[in-house]
Amino acid sequence: SKFQDFWTNKILNPHHKILAEDEIDEIARILDKRAKGNKPGSVHVANLNINPGAMRKMFNDIKNNAPLAKIMKDIFLESNQEKRGGLIDQLYKNNKKKPRKINQLTTPEAIPINAMLCAWDPKKNISIASLRHREMLIDHFEFEGDTDFKNDSDGEKIVKSNDQIINGFKSLGLK
C-alpha cells in the first residue's frame, strides 16, 4: 500500500532525510477526509480533522524520533493483538515524555493511530477511527466482547474494539 511504502521508504529510511510537503499531503489524503487536495468522492480512511501544518509536523516529528517510529512499525507488523495492545500502550507512554511529545499522535480518541492501522492493513483494521464511535457502534448492535472503554488501557481499547466490531459483523453474516 502507499502508506506502507511511505512508512518503510520515507519514515524509517535514514537516507531519506527530509519529508517533502507533497509526500505528507499524499498520505494525509489517504488518512483524512478533509486533507488538502481531497475532493468529493475521494477515498480516505477517516475524518482526522488535523490541519495540514499539524499533519506535516506530526509525520516529521515521527521521522525524527527513531524510537517512536520503530514502536509504530512494530505495532503495524504485530499480528498478536495482545502484544499489539502492549506496544500501543508503550507508544502512548513514550509519547508523553517532554520535550519530544508528538502532538496529534496519541489522542484519547485514538483517531490518528486507528487511521494509520487501517491504512497499513485495511483487511484487519476497521476504518472507524474514533473510540467513542466504536463504543456507540458496539452498544447499538450489542456486539459480544469484553472491551471496557472506561477501564482498559489505550492499547486494549484499540485492539479489543477493532476485533469486537469485526467479529460482531461476522456474527451478522457480513464479511
Where are these regions (language model features)?
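An N-terminal alpha-helical hairpin/helix-loop-helix interaction module that forms a charged
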Residues: 1-106, 123-175
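Helix-hairpin-helix
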Residues: 100-118
